[in-house]
Amino acid sequence: MKTLEQIFDNVELIGQTPNMIMKVQLPDFIFDEVKSWIEPCRSIKDNEYAELLNHRNVGTGHNTYQTGIAKKYVDNTYFLGYVINIAELYLKTINYQNVNMDGSFYRKVAMRDNPGHYDGYDIWMNFTYKGDDNPVHNHAGNLSSIIYVKDEDSQPTIFPSLNYTHQPKEGEMLLFPNHLQHMVEEKQTESERISVSYNLNILQSEQQMY
């Protein structure tokens, strides 16, 4: 069994607190779970009633389509465990002060949730084509992420406040504070671009380890 140190041995840091970005190449096993969501989400996109399940945010009307990823595809996955653990590592790296009594961040992070709403967890898939863009924006929650699922042309993500332009690779994930603004310029090529974004909450109440 791999240790957490072995699982996250390829983490890279970009910038500094309070705007630090954590970059990682997802293990193939985890990335395969992410890619398994493409067809269910594409099926929603291609349905004549797709507007009913449109994930609405700043990117709505700029990306061709965005839809939430159903909870059933996220719950009990290694992906969810990976996300929670790397977020705890992020908090440790920035010396976040709201730690448990034992000094850990165990159960300090959770997927942002929308109970009773079709969006479910605050995790969604973006389908982007020629002419699409994503204007400058930030996210809800406390920690936010981008996963580059399909991007053969490596469409850059721009972080204006850091003066940083990220050239993505498929399977790469960025984790950063929710307030960090970013954008994607208009897509000039014909290829399909697919990304996943999600938002996490930092839980403020003391949690017990059982």
What does each of the following model-derived ranges do?
Residues K72, N76, N138, T189:
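Aromatic-acidic/polar surface patches that form glycan- and anion
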Residues M1-D113, D133:
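Non-heme Fe(II)/2-oxoglutarate
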Residues Y106-E185, S191-S195, N199-Y210:
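Catalytic core of non-heme Fe(II) oxygenases with the double-stranded beta-helix
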